Every structure is written in structure tokens, then in C-alpha cells.
Amino acid sequence: MLYFSTNNKAPLVNFKDATINGQAPDKGLYFPKNIPVLSPGFIKNIADYSDVAIAYEIIKPYVGDKIHAGMLKKIVEETINFPIPLVPINDTISSLELYHGPTLAFKDVGARFMSRCLGFFVKNQPKKVTVLVATSGDTGGAVANGFYDVPNVEVIILYPSGKVSTVQEKQLTTLGKNIHALEVNGSFDDCQQMVKDIFARAADFTNLFLTSANSINVARWLPQQFYYFFAYKQWADKNNPPVIAVPSGNFGNICAGILAHASGLPIKHFIAACNANDVVPNFFETDIYEPKKAVATISNAMDVGNPSNFVRILEIFNQQTGDLKKLVSAKSVSDDETRATLKKVKDEYNYLLDPHGAVGYNALEKYLQQHPAQKGIVVETAHPVKFFDVVEPIIGSPVAIPQIIQDQLKLKKQSELMENNPEALRDFLMKL
């Protein structure tokens, strides 16, 4: 498989080079030259396959011959060595729980897959490989966990000061060793821009080999397709495929779902469920894509004012927004609606959503009210305990804290304060 840049001003590369480079040299995102089409027999008999076999079948054409079959199977096994259950909430809505991995967030899958691919690719790299990642919350913890103690790899995580939850901050600031947490005086978009600015000047860092672990990296983005196949495998009514609502911030997760659909996975409709950061919902209404400064919400991992992966979604549809709107809709949900939904679902169905899942549930519920013949899935992206400081006042009772989180909360934070300035990041990298 070859990959081109969405800006169309960079050479084609293979999976290995796309993974190592992160972003294309023309600042575009890598995108597969061809979208593999899965056989109808595979889809029809999906219930007969193990999750590992499904994931291997999906990712194999994207990797090509850059990782041999035995190693790729091992990477897949280590990536999804935890359950991803589809849990009914009520008669019409089920929750796809993506939070049973080591950091209790959906990003564990992409981070684990990418860290193992990159570790395989850079074993003999003479320069020190430096992974730069901006996080609005869960990416940082998942990347830190995935790359912790990987030889010859340093990980630099930028996160907006005061804009991630207590648990999220502990997960990305307490490991030490090859994991460096930089607490930036700014927003997630500022952090992401600092990373992009550094990549644009990669030639300045002669002693480092820079790459990214954000969902712009194909090795983090592509394995997110797995969830959607696992959901369909567990979906009872194969003759009536689900509507899937995806809490959306940087749009990597829903983009992977749409890519899975393009490969042949039966999905009736996708809903991009956004918070007050409504750039994409506005685009669906006006056909004008106008990035904005991110605003802070209680679903902080989606506080993104210029979603990087939206360009990939447009690429899947060959820039045909009419075709896009047939399969996908976008909905903005306020914090008040999020709180009300979270409380209602807990009170009525005894199911506890996190704030991001509540955004997804709200958008899905509204869609199903207009399409009563359909049933749907909300993609639940994180365990509610990761946002206990938001959730507990809403439901009026404590969230049960898993032992793994109790242990993390006792650890000492290790971070370095940094101004919102690419030069400050450049100076930090020069000292590595």
C-alpha cells in the first residue's frame, strides 16, 4: 500500500515511511492510495472470526510487506488484548465500550498499535527517535503507556494547562523515563500548532528523528477501524445495520469508521457528535469550513476548533460533500444537554456514561426520534472515572474508582511548564 499527501505536493510513501514521518513534508496528512475492499464472505461470516483475526485481516493490506506476517499478528494481539463489548443501554441504543484497555480510553488501541509498529521500524535507526504528540486529554495517557520504556524512543507530550481532567493529567505526567510531559499555557489547538510548527522545521534537529503520535499518524488512525468491525460482529440484527454516533473532536475515530464503511462494512449512518466546538456541524449546514478558537467544555477531549482529520473524511468522498451528507450528519450538543443526558441515562437505565459518551448519546437519541425504524450504537470512548470531577456532581454520587486509577492518582506529577511558543519547544528539543 502506498500513501499520498492530502496536499498532493509530496512523494508517495509506503506504510513504514508514513508511520515514521507522521506528517507529509508538504504538511498534508497521509492517505491510502487505494481503499481495500473486503470480500462479502468475510463480512457475512464475521461472527466466525476472532477479534484478532478480524483486526489482522483489516490492517494487513494497509501495512503491505513492511511488517512480516508473524510480527504483524503479534502486534495485533498485543494491541487488542482487552475486551471491546457492545452493551445494550435500552431497546434502541447500545454502547460500544472502548475503555477496557490500560488507560481506560479508546485511544489505547491506536497508541498500542503505533508504538509497536514504530518500535519495530526504528530498531536500527541511528538517530534518537522523538515522538511529538499534542493531547486534549486521552491521547497523552494512551501514548505514554504505549511507548513507555520503548528503547531508542523519546516521547514529548504537550497538553493545555488546566484543561485536562485529574486522571488524564496523572496518566500522562507520572511515568518518567522516556516520557516527557510539557504543560502548555494555551489550548489544545495551540499545542497542536506548536507540534506542526516543529515538523515544518524538522531539518533544524540534526540529532533527532521526529515523528508524531497524534491521529494524523496512519499507524494510530487506521487501527481505529477495528472497533467498528467488532461492533458489527456483535450486532444482532445484521439485516438492519446500526446508526453509529461517534463523539468527535479531532475526527480520527469517526474517520476510521467511515473508512471501514468504504471497505464494505455495513453501517446505516454515522453521526459526528460534537460539543460546543461546532466547526463541522456548521460546515454541514453552510458548506463553509471555518476553523475557530476552541472553547472549553465538560467533554474536554473534544475541545478542538480545527479538526485535523476532517480533510481525510473529505478525501474518502473525493471532496463530494453531497455524498458525505448522505452517510454522515453532525450535531452540536451543549454542556447543559450533556449533563441532562448523563443524569437521565443513569437514572432511567442505570448506565453511567462519561461526558463524551453523553454527547454521543444525545445526538443519537435525537436522530432516532426522527428515524424510529432504526437502532443505534453510541461509541463510549472513555471510562466515566476519568472525568469523575465532572460526573459526580451531575449524578450526585461517587464514581467507583478502578484499582488501576487509584494507584495512578497516588503518583507524583512530573511536568514542565511551557509558554505557548514554538521557540520554547524548539529549545527543549535541542537539549534532548
Role assignments for model-derived ranges:
Residues 1-432:
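PLP-dependent amino-acid enzyme catalytic core
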